[in-house]
């Protein structure tokens, strides 16, 4: 019974701490888009879509549209 109470109190304290820190950090990151694109390499930024004539499927993204397994 004591162990159950201790576990419940610990979970409540940890939850409260997470909620407090989440509210404090709200709006702290000013430039989200700048930071997310800075982590990407140049090859990831330039090869987002496949050119026309390339094979396409579920996992590949065409610059135009995928028609019968080829980018158009």
Swiss-Prot record:
- Positions carrying 4-hydroxyproline are 55
A Pfam family: Conotoxin
- Please verify whether the record's keywords include Nucleus: no
Principal location: secreted
- Entry domain remark: The presence of a 'disulfide through disulfide knot' structurally defines this protein as a knottin.
The entry assigns this protein to a family as follows:
Belongs to the conotoxin O1 superfamily.
Q: What is this protein called?
A: Omega-conotoxin-like SVIA mutant 1
Q: Give the organism, scientific name.
A: Conus striatus (Striated cone)
């Amino acid at each position: 019974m004591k162990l159950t109470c201790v576990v419940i109190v610990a979970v409540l304290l940890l939850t409260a701490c997470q909620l407090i820190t989440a509210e404090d950090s709200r709006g702290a990151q000013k430039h989200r888009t700048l930071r997310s694109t800075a982590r990407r390499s140049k090859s990831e930024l330039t090869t987002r879509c496949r050119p026309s004539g390339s094979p396409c499927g579920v996992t590949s993204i065409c610059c135009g549209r995928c028609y019968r397994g080829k980018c158009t």
